[in-house]
Amino acid sequence: MRRKFLCGLAAFAWAPGLWAQPVPARDLWEFPLGSVLEPAALASEPGGGLWNPATTLTSGTERWRLGVAALSSASDQSVDGQLIAATFRRTNGIAFGASIARSAVASILRTETDPQSLGEVPYSSLLMSITAARAIVPHVTAGVALRYREGHADQLVNHAFAADLGIIVHSLPVLDARIAVSSFLWRPGKEIDDRPAVLAAVDARLMGTTDRETRLGLSYNGVNRGAKELGPFVSWRFDRVDLRGAYLRTSASGRSVSRIRWGMALHYARYVVGFAREEGASELGPLYQFTLSSMLR
């Protein structure tokens, strides 16, 4: 079964039809939609494996996970995003996920020689993903994603498929450490046009147990020919409450900016509700996020 699963990963990665034309609005997927409590490479809320397909398989006992997420910025030229996701875990240990995400920028005004506005320029992107993940050896989970992306920029509309691979090494004997790496929006041969990203994170438990712990880690998100983000993060878990803070340094086009991201979540019965705020992302003002997920056995 493990051999079949690895063959499936390779088949997805080299599936025919991945060599479409460039798709506009790629930069909208540099905003961390749904990544409230953990960096993108480790983010398991609200499910579906949007950023790292290996997170489709969770460590819990639930068979179903349903979740939604929303992102918005408080500025005149605002960014907003929505995500709906579902995950199903089979009795043989393989988990499947599906998600639909949309991101857009509003209030881009169309002008000509006259400064008077001629209306708004549409700028948005839709991303649909199907993921699968399973444990391939003890402490190692691998996942694969097949994605369809559509982008709108004024009159230009285009779409393409992409395939991603992700892996998480977890529950290591030393400090319960975790290591996660994933590609994002990868199309072989189109690395310049599509600017795929590499997402990575590592963290370890400083003190406590599973339900009451403090973890410290380092995250990295790097877009090909685009922004590079690096910074430490810390998380606290105390029974039903999660708290997280991160200090991030982003470099792009010869400039660097530092910002703080913080979030919190409440675990109640089979529900998880999360909220996060990020300072000064992409010069669009603060970003606010909300997530809600439900786990069914």
Residue ranges and their predicted role:
Residues 78-105, 109-176, 180:
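Transmembrane beta-barrel wall of Gram-negative outer-membrane proteins
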Residues 56-63, 90-95, 135-139, 170-176, ...:
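Short loop/turn motifs that connect adjacent beta-strands in outer-membrane beta-barrel proteins
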Residues 18-92, 287, 292-295:
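N-terminal, post-signal peptide beta-strand-biased segments of exported outer-membrane/organellar beta-barrel
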Residues 1-4, 138:
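Positively charged n-region of N-terminal signal peptides that target proteins for export
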Residues 7-17:
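Bacterial N-terminal signal peptides
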Residues 63-88, 101-119, 124-127, 211-216, ...:
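Transmembrane beta-barrel domains of bacterial outer-membrane proteins
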Residues 46, 178-179, 190-297:
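Outer membrane beta-barrel transmembrane domains
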Residues 40-42, 71-75, 117-121, 151-156, ...:
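Outer-membrane beta-barrel domain signature
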